[in-house]
């Protein structure tokens, strides 16, 4: 249950960062994963993605986004079979990168790399 998913996830992640630093982890060994799909509704996931650039601006750590083949993509597209969500997964990866994600976890590496190369070459982002 979230009343403000973005704020609550950011606060949770900051708590985890603080705990890691107190436990002696080097800051350069940390990255953040907002946990798309884990205990969140479709709207929560959409809000997190739409707010990604905003909340990342307040973080000193790289962000990993893993939405490949997720249920949220099936809910948006109406495609029930995860393996058939490649196009949606590539689109979500591009949206994540466009919003500043440092790392994207994907199943369809070749297809995602092709899409990223096209976006880079066409100047969608540098």
Model-derived segments and spans:
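Active-site-adjacent loop and "lid" segments of alpha/beta metabolic enzymes
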Residues: 1-23, 28, 39-126
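Acidic/histidine-rich catalytic cores of soluble enzymes
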Residues: 36
